[in-house]
Amino acid sequence: MERIRLKLKAYDHRVLDRTVAAIVEAVKRTGADIRGPIPMPTKIKRYTVLKSPHINKDSREQFEIRIHARMLDIIAATPDTVDSLTKLDLAPEVSVEVRAMGK
């Protein structure tokens, strides 16, 4: 068939790694070749808010959220591989982006 690229993102790296392990196991069972998981750079979003609702701008609080990402390339995916990927029960915290690529 063709190559399939999966990009997975999550706030918790442990949930992300468990999901990646389940995908890798399902793909290897179908006999397709897999490249990865490739860890992508962690994106950090920082937010600064005032502690006081009215005055005192010197008093601020900072929050951050980290977005962890992994990438998988499935080489020579078969219809059986695609079927096993659609039947996987993935964690709801993980965002999965699927892109079919040419040979």
Curated annotation (Swiss-Prot):
Q: Which domain of life is it from?
A: Bacteria
| Gene3D superfamilies noted in UniProt | Ribosomal protein S10 domain
**Any one biological process term the GO annotation gives:** translation
PROSITE patterns xref list: RIBOSOMAL_S10
Bridged cysteine pairs (disulfide): none
Look up and give the organism this protein is from.
Campylobacter jejuni subsp. doylei (strain ATCC BAA-1458 / RM4099 / 269.97)
Record-stated family: Belongs to the universal ribosomal protein uS10 family.
| Keywords on record | Ribonucleoprotein, Ribosomal protein
Q: Which InterPro entries match?
A: Ribosomal_uS10, Ribosomal_uS10_CS, Ribosomal_uS10_dom, Ribosomal_uS10_dom_sf
- State the protein's name: Small ribosomal subunit protein uS10
Coiled-coil segments: none
GO molecular-function term, one example from the UniProt record: structural constituent of ribosome
Q: Does the keyword Ribosomal protein apply?
A: yes
Cite the NCBIfam families for this sequence: PRK00596.1 (NF001861), rpsJ_bact (TIGR01049)
Q: Summarize subunit and interaction data from the UniProt record for this chain.
A: Part of the 30S ribosomal subunit.
Q: What this chain does, per the record?
A: Involved in the binding of tRNA to the ribosomes.
**GO CC annotation, single:** ribonucleoprotein complex
Lineage summary: Bacteria, Pseudomonadati, Campylobacterota, Epsilonproteobacteria, Campylobacterales
Which SMART domains does the protein's record reference? Ribosomal_S10
